[in-house]
């Protein structure tokens, strides 16, 4: 990622959304439950925990204790995740989601997404409501992971007849939203000022954050039931600042937003706070500003 357009560059990493598994037939007791172990693909584009490698590249990683929400059966307005599995691996390119699932049959299909805590509600048409927070908590080097929604395409499972174990390899995910990188630039008076809050406001009808109704089977956004045209980053530690020693490293604000396009001529507003200053800048776009879904843009 190396160019900045109107002080704003967008990055989103592609990830495929296909997975399947097959095991032996199994008359497993629903009370005893089925033990799931799901290994994610080793594709480094699966997860957007962005570690900067100091060479212009970024290595996406899963973190230990990441949570995967899985859904088995019909989804309606009363639905909650059938189970939540936990990554038992240390931080790395591959996650192993592990957990016991009760009340399900010996075989079937499941839908899933991470992180599980983004789940808000189910809908009668089979979609799930997933929250993309208006106020986010990134660090100086990475997005707020809680906002990076990754959906896996529906996968099949079949438990081992003796052990009740399900092992699934190479579960691939699709990123639902777009990552925005804003490089902080300002007058000399702001040099060495550390940002505590920074926001991006788009035109009124633009949707940046809110609650999306997502079809987990197709990994698509059906509609937004709650929508905001703003996104705000807040910091308590590990915050970016102005005039840092390492441009594009310690002077960067990261957001996660709804994919879309803001047309030429529209106005966007950047605003923020440091310990000593508040600042606002309105920018009129000379060309379209696009936040792409699941792809890399510079």
Where are the model-predicted features located?
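Sec-type signal peptide cleavage vicinity
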Residues: 2-298
């Amino acid at each position: 990622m190396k160019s900045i357009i109107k002080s704003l560059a967008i990055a989103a990493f592609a990830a495929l959304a296909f997975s399947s598994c097959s095991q032996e037939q199994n008359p497993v007791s629903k009370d005893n439950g089925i033990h799931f172990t799901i290994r994610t693909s080793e594709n480094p584009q699966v997860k957007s925990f962005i570690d900067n490698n100091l060479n212009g590249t970024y290595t996406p990683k899963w973190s230990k204790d990441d949570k995967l929400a899985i859904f088995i059966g019909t989804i309606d307005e009363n639905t909650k995740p059938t189970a939540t599995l936990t990554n038992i691996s240390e931080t790395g390119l591959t996650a192993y989601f592990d957990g016991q699932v009760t009340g399900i049959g010996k075989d079937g299909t499941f839908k899933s997404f991470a992180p599980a805590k983004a789940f808000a509600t189910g809908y009668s048409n089979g979609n799930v409501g997933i929250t993309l927070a208006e106020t986010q908590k990134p660090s100086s080097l990475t997005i707020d992971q809680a906002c990076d929604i990754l959906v896996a395409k529906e996968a099949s499972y079949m438990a081992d007849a003796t052990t009740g174990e399900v092992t699934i390899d190479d579960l691939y995910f699709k990123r639902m939203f777009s990552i925005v990188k804003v490089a902080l630039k300002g007058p000399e008076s702001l040099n060495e000022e550390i940002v505590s809050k920074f926001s991006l406001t788009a035109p009124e009808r633009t949707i940046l954050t809110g609650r999306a109704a997502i079809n987990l089977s197709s990994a698509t956004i059906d509609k937004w039931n709650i929508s905001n045209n703003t996104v705000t980053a807040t910091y308590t530690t590990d915050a970016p600042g102005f005039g840092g020693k390492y441009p594009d490293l310690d002077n960067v604000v990261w957001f996660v937003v709804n994919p879309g396009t803001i047309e030429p001529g529209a106005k966007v507003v950047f605003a923020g706070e440091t310990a000593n200053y508040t600042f606002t800048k309105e920018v009129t776009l000379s060309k379209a500003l696009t936040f792409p879904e699941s792809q890399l843009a510079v």
